A protein has these predicted regions:
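Residue patterns forming the tRNA-binding/recognition surfaces of aminoacyl-tRNA synthetases
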Residues: 65-214
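Positions that flank functional sites
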Residues: 51, 97, 126, 288-289
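Short, mixed-charge, low-aromatic patches
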Residues: 28-38, 60-68, 124-130, 142-150, ...
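Structured secondary-structure scaffolds
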Residues: 2-47, 99-103, 156-294
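N-terminal Rossmann-like or analogous alpha/beta NTP/dinucleotide-binding catalytic cores
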Residues: 2-117, 131, 272
Length: 294
């Protein structure tokens, strides 16, 4: 029986330049890919850049550039950085590519037609840098727990994914598959999140406010929320749903991430997969932050 290994880094956000944290995760993924190739595994190593959303749009405006020109320039710097480090990836996915947009709209349509996406109004505390809403409980002294910056109170009409519907299933799946999320401390952190209602996930932004994104297939006045868009790179790069690469590699997926994006990968992504009828990834491997002397 053929041995198969699929390893991914997060796709890196292009609102800023490559940094040491990006390099650390990518070097670890490169090491794992090389080791598995040497051990006889058919191996696929994916990295890339996340190029839509409000933060990127604002960064392009601040730089005085067209958003597409801005993301082309910064994405190119990630590629050059990996070339300088000798990173031997098999594919570099960009969320502005047509192959990715096609898959995002396909999955959105599938989940929408199944009744798991609805329109509603939301008011909450929003971090522009994270591009996500937080509850009062999640804030640290009233600030974003990741960036330490003030959050904005926002109220707007969005489309929502029925994420709460899949919470009991996800709890059970994680409990029955103790090796899914590693190390164990992060698995326990996710189970603690799931012990309480997680609510539904806002998966769109009004195009009038955030014009830089993938339009919803049923409503051109809204673009796709950046996390619902970005997470699908792991299957769009494999030519989901019909590609030979998808059939071969997806059942063996190892995601490597930093702890700051644990919830999107351990809660958003599994529930999206379940709703779309896509099998779960094999492992989610979580690392901490690189800290300086201060």
């Amino acid at each position: 029986m053929e041995k198969v290994f699929y390893v991914t880094t997060p796709i890196y956000y292009v609102n800023a330049e490559p940094h040491l944290g990006h390099a650390y995760t990518t070097v670890v993924a490169d090491f794992l890919a090389r080791w598995h190739r040497l051990d006889g595994y058919r191996t696929f190593f994916l990295t890339g850049t996340d190029e839509h959303g409000e933060t990127v749009y604002r960064a392009a405006q601040a730089a005085g550039e067209d958003p597409k020109a801005f993301v082309d320039r910064v994405s190119g710097r990630f590629k050059r950085a990996w070339d300088l480090l000798g990173i031997a990836y098999d594919d570099f996915i960009r969320t502005t590519e047509e192959r990715h947009k096609k898959v995002v709209q396909l999955v959105l349509k599938k989940v929408y037609e199944a009744g798991d996406i609805y329109y509603g109004e939301y008011e909450g505390l929003y971090c522009v840098s994270c591009e996500r809403f937080y509850t009062e409980k999640e804030l640290v002294e009233g600030l974003c727990p990741i960036h330490g910056r003030p959050v904005e109170r926002r109220k707007e009409g969005n489309y929502f994914f029925r994420m709460e519907k899949y919470r009991p299933w996800l709890q059970e799946y994680i409990q029955e598959n103790p090796d899914l999320i590693r190390p164990e401390g992060y698995r326990n952190e996710v189970l603690a999140m799931l012990a309480e209602p997680i609510g539904d996930l806002s998966i769109s932004r009004p195009k009038s406010r955030v014009p830089w994104g993938i339009p919803l297939p049923w409503d051109e006045n809204h673009v796709t929320y950046v996390w619902f868009d970005a997470l699908l790179n792991y299957v769009s790069a494999l030519d989901y749903p019909e590609g030979e690469a998808y059939r071969t590699f997806w059942p063996h997926a190892w995601h490597l991430i930093g702890k700051d994006i644990l919830k999107p990968h351990a809660v958003f992504w599994p529930t999206m997969l379940k709703a779309a009828g896509i099998p779960m990834y094999r492992h989610l491997n979580v690392g901490g932050f690189l800290l300086g002397p201060d």
